[in-house]
């Protein structure tokens, strides 16, 4: 497991540390997500030859990714996982730009670009 150590300035040590840590970790995830999601989006754009009209990184309650109306939304929580998982989630959402449901054509496209998609599906389902 990876360990992240956060040191707070002395003036915050007696305050509500849990809330401060939640905010700090959230901001850290957002900053890392911006870099990692941008990397994965560009990689997938080059691989597939198309891109969404827009994408955003926004905290979501349960989902790590979503595709609606030619826009992909990715949760900053995605950075808790390996790059392979991030790449898979972005690819998964890209495939939804072409196919809204998990129809046979969608699965065929997903499998074409990620032959091990079932491994990642199982992993994401257990998050």
PLM segments and residue spans:
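Walker B catalytic acidic pair
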Residues: 93
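Active-site-proximal or metal-binding-adjacent scaffold patches in catalytic folds
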Residues: 1-88, 97-127
């Amino acid at each position: 497991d990876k360990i992240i150590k956060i040191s707070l300035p002395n003036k915050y040590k007696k305050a509500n540390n849990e809330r401060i840590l939640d905010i700090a970790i959230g901001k850290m995830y957002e900053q890392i997500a911006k870099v990692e999601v941008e990397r994965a989006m560009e990689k997938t754009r080059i691989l597939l030859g198309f891109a969404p009209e827009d994408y955003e990184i926004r905290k979501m309650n349960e989902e790590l990714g979503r595709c609606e109306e030619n826009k992909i939304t990715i949760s900053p929580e995605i950075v808790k996982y390996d790059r392979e998982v991030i790449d898979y989630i972005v690819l998964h959402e890209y495939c939804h730009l072409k196919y809204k449901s998990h129809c046979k054509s969608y699965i065929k496209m997903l499998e074409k670009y990620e032959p091990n998609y079932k491994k990642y599906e199982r992993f994401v389902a257990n998050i």
